[in-house]
Amino acid sequence: MDLLVMLLSLLVSYLIFKIWKRIDSKRDQNCYILDYQCHKPSDDRMVNTQFSGDIILRNKHLRLNEYKFLLKAIVSSGIGEQTYAPRLFFEGREQRPTLQDGLSEMEEFYIDTIEKVLKRNKISPSEIDILVVNVSMLNSTPSLSARIINHYKMREDIKVFNLTAMGCSASVISIDIVKNIFKTYKNKLALVVTSESLSPNWYSGNNRSMILANCLFRSGGCAVLLTNKRSLSRRAMFKLRCLVRTHHGARDDSFNACVQKEDELGHIGVHLDKTLPKAATRAFIDNLKVITPKILPVTELLRFMLCLLLKKLRSSPSKGSTNVTQAAPKAGVKAGINFKTGIDHFCIHTGGKAVIDAIGYSLDLNEYDLEPARMTLHRFGNTSASSLWYVLGYMEAKKRLKRGDRVFMISFGAGFKCNSCVWEVVRDLNVGEAVGNVWNHCINQYPPKSILNPFFEKYGWIHEEEDPDTFKMPEGFM
C-alpha cells in the first residue's frame, strides 16, 4: 500500500513538474519592447513649401499637367511643412545619386538612433544577441546589417537578418522574426533597425503612376530594443500579445499593385497601380479575419455573430414572395465589430491621408483615434516601415498610454502584404521618462488648429484650367 502511495506521489509530482516547466518556458518566450528611438534629422534637411516647389521644377521631363498633378497630390497628402529629405536634394543632385549618398543617409540615421537607445538603457553593443535590419530600397555589399556590426564591433555569434524589398510593412515582419527567435533562445536582447533610403530612389520621369511616390515619402527611421529576459520585464514598455501576417503575392493584381520598374524612358521608379486600394482592402480584411478572434472579448464576437444572424434573417424573403426588396433589412441593427472593446489605441501606418481615412472608416474610429496617425503624417510624412513608431511616440508624448492598454499596429506593404500586431502597455508611460521621444520638442503644438497645406494658398492656380500652350508660371513660383 505504501509503495502504491509512493508511486502515485511520484507520478503526481512528475506531472506537476512538467506543467510548471511548460508554463515557465512560456514565460521566457515573451517578447518585450524595452525602448525605442525615432530619428529626427537635422533642421538643415527640413522640407518646406518653397523647397518642394523648387524640387518639382528641377524635373525637366514634367509637362504642365504633370506639374499640376504633382502639386495637387502634395496639397491633399496631409503632409506639413516640417518633414525631412536626404542631403543630396538640397545639393540639387536628386537625379544623379551615388551609392555613397544612400549609405551616408543610412549611417546618419542608425548612428543617431542606436547610440541613443543603447546609452539610455546602459546596454553595450556587445550585449546584443539578435540584429534585424529592414531597409527596402537599398541593397549594398556588405549589407547594412554588416556595416552596423562593423561600426559597433558586435559579437561574432550575433544572429543577423537583413531584410530588403519588404515595403512599408517591414517593421512588423522584423518583430515577427524576433518573436520566433525568442521562442527558442532564452535571455536574449534584440535590436530592430528600420528605415528607408530615399537618396537613390528619386523618380525623374513623368509617369503619373510613378511620380506619386516622390510626394509621399520622407526621411526617418527607428531603432527598437527588445528582450525576452524575465529580469528586464519590469523595465519594459510593451509586451507583444499577438501578431498576424497576410501575404497576397499569389494574386497577380495584388502582386502588381506596387512594383519597382522602369518607365518608357528607362527611368526607375515605384509604380502604384489603380488596383492598389482594392489589393490593400482585400489584404486588410483577410488579416482582420485572423487577428480579430485573438484580440476581442468573446462577448463582442457573440454580439457580432448575433447581429449578422438577425441581419440575414431580416434580409431573407418571406415565403411566397418573389420580390427580394420587400425583405430589405431594417435600420437599427449594427453588424460591425466594435474593436474598442479589446483595443485602446490604433497605431496606423501613415501611407497617406486616404489610407488613414479608409482604416478609420473600416474600423469605425473617431478623430481622437486617428489623431496620432494624422499628426505623424503632418509632422514627419510617410517614413515607410518606421512610421508606426512615430505614431506610437505621439501617443506616448501625449501621455495616452496607461498600464494595461492595448495598442493595435496596422501596416501595409508591397507584395501585397498586410501585417498587424497588438502590444500591451506594461507600465504607465509618461513623457517625463522618455527623454528621447522624437515628439518632445513640438508636442505642445499638436494637434494644430489647421493642417491645411500651405500649397493650397501659394499654388491655388493648380485647380484652374489652363492652356498648356499659353500658360506661364505665376510670379513668385520660381
UniProtKB/Swiss-Prot annotation:
Pathway participation: Lipid metabolism; fatty acid biosynthesis
Active site, per annotation: 168, 247, 345, 349, 378, 382
Keyword Zinc-finger tagged: no
Cellular component aspect of the GO annotation: endoplasmic reticulum; membrane
Name the record gives this protein: 3-ketoacyl-CoA synthase 3
Cellular compartment(s): Endoplasmic reticulum
BP GO terms, sorted: fatty acid biosynthetic process; response to cold; response to light stimulus
Keyword Isomerase included in the entry's annotation: no
Enzyme class: transferase
Induction: Repressed by herbicides such as flufenacet and benfuresate. Down-regulated by darkness and low temperature, and up-regulated by salt, drought and osmotic stress.
Source species: Arabidopsis thaliana (Mouse-ear cress)
Keywords: Acyltransferase, Endoplasmic reticulum, Signal, Transferase
Domain FAE: start-end pairs: 26-313
Assigned EC number: 2.3.1.199
TM helices/strands, residue ranges: none
Catalyzed reactions per annotation: a very-long-chain acyl-CoA + malonyl-CoA + H(+) = a very-long-chain 3-oxoacyl-CoA + CO2 + CoA
GO molecular function term, any single one: fatty acid elongase activity
InterPro entries named in the record: 3-ktacl-CoA_syn (IPR012392), ACP_syn_III_C (IPR013747), FAE1_typ3_polyketide_synth (IPR013601), Thiolase-like (IPR016039)
Span of the signal peptide: 1-25
